[in-house]
Amino acid sequence: MPLAQLPTIDYCGLTIILGKPSRFDTHKLLSGHAGYLFTKYLHPAIVESISLQVATEPVTILPNTKVVLLLGDEAVAKYYPIEEGKPTTLNDARGNPAMGKDGVIYICSYAPQDAADVKDYESPEGDDDDGEDSDDSSSVKSHGVTKRRNWKWWLKADIKKAFYLAKHGMAPEEDFNIKLYPEIDEVINTLLTPHGEYLYLDIETSAQQTLTCVGFNFSDSKNVYVVPWKTYQNTLTYSDNLCRKFIQALTVAMGRNTVVCHNAAFDLLVLAYKYKIPLPRKVEDTMLMWHRCYPEVEKSLGHLISYFLNRRYHKGEGIYSPHNATQELQLYTYNGKDIVTTRGIHIGLKAELVKTGAEKSADWANRMLRPYLTATLRGIKTDVAAFCKRYDNLEAKRLALNRCIAIITSRPDMNVRSWQQVTKYLYAEQKLPCPDPKNPTNSKTLLRLLTKHKIPSIKLILMSKRTGKLSSSMKIRLWMDLTTKSTDNFNRWTCGYNIAGTDSFRLGSRAIFKYKRGDAEGKIGYGTNLQNQKKEQRTLFVSDTGLKLGQVDQAGAEALIVAYLCRHGRFRDLFLNGIKSHVFVGLHVFKDAWKKRIDNPDCVDALCDLNPRELKLHPDFKKVERLIKDSDAWPAAERYYFIAKMICHASNYGM
C-alpha cells in the first residue's frame, strides 16, 4: 500500500520527501513520537496542506511546488541538487537551500525518527555514538559534526526555514565585489579611511601559524578584499616594505573600528603573537554571541550559515596548504566567502540576541576576549629547573610503582596502562566482581573495588595511574616569555581560554596552536589546560618580579546556584551561615566515622540535631568541620569528604 500523503486542503507549496519509512511507519508516514514532533514543529494546521512522500516509492512533485524538504540520507542522495565535482552529504548540505533545475528550492535535514531516537535504532548495527565533534580550533570554522542530541533542534530550525521559503521565496543573495589579490595601495587606503564601523575580518594560516591570506570588509562597503600574504612557494606576495605598511594599516583599522570575527580568539592571537598587532578594544565574536543565545547547540561557522543564511555550503572548499596556483585561488575564494557569510551572520545575530534576551550576556563575553587573550600571551612563569626535576621524579616514581606491581602480581610484563591486562588480572585471575563492565579499569571503578576488597595491588595500580597522569600532563611545550627581548626564554605555562567552551558558560582552556595536521611540534602545541591543575602542579607557578600570585575561586558555586534556584530552606541557610554543603552532608552520612576519631563522640549526635544557624555557633563545630575536611587525604576507602562531595553533586544534578 502506498504511504504517500497528498494535501487534503489547499496546497501550500511544500513537499516533504522522507528517505525511508521508519520502523513505526507500517500504515502511514510519520507515525509515533517522531510524527508528533514533526507535526508540532510544522504546526498541525499546516500538515494538511503539504505533500508528504517517501523516496522508496515513486515521487511526484506537484504543480506549484516551491520547496522540497528532504529528510534523511537516502532522500538527500537521490534528490538534492549537487554541484559538479562537489559531492554532498547530509551533514554538509543540511539547512543550506539549493535551487534545482526545475526552479524548485531543495533543502535537507535529519529524518524525524533519527532526530527523535537517542541512538541509531534504524540501522542494523545500531551505533551508540553521539557524534560529538572535538572542540578544537579547526572545527569551529567548518560545518563540523552535529551531536545527535541536537538533531531535533536543527530539524526544527530547518522545518521553519523550509516553510518560510515556501511562503516568501528565496531572496536574491546580496551582491559583493570580492577582490582577490588587490592592489596593495588600494587596500592600505581602504583600511585607513573608516572610523567607528564594523570591520569583518578572517585570516587563513599555515600549520606554523603564519598568514596565508587576510580577508576583510567594512560594514558600509560591498567590497571584500582578500589580501594574499604568502604564495604556495612560501614567498611573500608583496615586497617586505609593502607588507609592513599593510600590517600597520590593519593595526590602525582594528583600533578605530569594531572587529567582527568568528572564533576571534584564534585570529587575534595569531595576529598579536606573530605580527605584533595589538589586541583591539572593540571585538564582536559571532561564535560567542551565538553561544550566548543557544549554549548547547553547535557553533561552527557552517552551522550558523545554515541557520541565518540561504547560501550553499562552501566550508568543504578550503585548501589550507595549497601546492599550486589553482589551489591558491581556491583558498582565496573560500576566504572571501567566509567574510561575506560572517557579515550576514553578524546582522542576523543582532536580532537573535534581542529575541533571546542575551544582549548583555553576549556583550560581557565579547569584553572578556581581550583580557583572556592577554593572559594567554603573558602565560604564567614557572621555575624550569623545578619543572624538569618534578617531571623526572614523577617518572621515577611511576617506574618504581610498576616494578612493585610486577612483583606483587607475579607478572613481570604487567603493563598498568593496558586496560586489557588490568581487566584480565583483576576479573579473570583474581575473580573479582566488576562494578562497572563499561569502565572496568577507570579510577572510580577501582576505588569501588577497594571499598569491599583489601587488595594491595589495586592501590598500587591507582597510584601508578595517578602518577602517570601527572607526568603526562607535564609533557608540554613551555611558552616564550614575551615580556623580554630574548627569543629562547621558554619558561611559562600558557593556555587558550575558551569562553564558549562549555554549555554552562564555565570557562574552558586547552593548549594553543595545536593541530591534527602538521609536524610533531604542531601536534603538541604550547601549554595545556590550566583550569584543572592539581595542587602539586600549581606549586610550580611563580610570580613575575614585583607581582604576587593570587587564587580566586567561588567555592561550591554549583551548589550555591541550586540553593537559590530552590525555595528558601535549610540548603540555602547553609550558604547564608558559611557552612559548606559537603561538610553538612558528610557530618550526617558518616557520623559513626567521626565518633571514632574525636575526643567527645557525643557532640557529633548533638551537631546532627542542629539547624545551620545553630550549628555554626556550636563550640565543637569547628573541630568536627576540620576533621571532615581532613578526611579528603585519608585512604581511598575512608575519603568521606570526597564521597559527601559526590553525593552533593549527584543531588544537584538530579542523578
Task: Give the residues covered by each predicted segment.
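Short, amphipathic alpha-helical "recognition" segments used to contact nucleic acids or chromatin
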Residues: 641-653
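Detector for conserved single-position "signature" residues within domains
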Residues: 565-566
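Acidic beta-strand-to-loop metal/phosphate-binding motif
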Residues: 66-73, 200, 257-267, 549-551
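Conserved "right-hand" nucleotidyltransferase catalytic core of DNA-directed polymerases
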Residues: 161-235, 296, 308-309, 313-316, ...
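Active-site flanking residues adjacent to catalytic metal/cofactor-binding acidic residues
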Residues: 18-19, 71, 110, 201, ...
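Active-site-proximal helix-loop-helix substrate-binding element of RNase H-like nuclease domains
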Residues: 104-107, 113-116, 122-146, 153-156, ...
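A polyanion-binding, active-site-adjacent surface
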Residues: 1-166
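Phosphate- and divalent-cation-binding pockets in alpha/beta enzyme and binding domains
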Residues: 78-79, 267-273, 425, 561
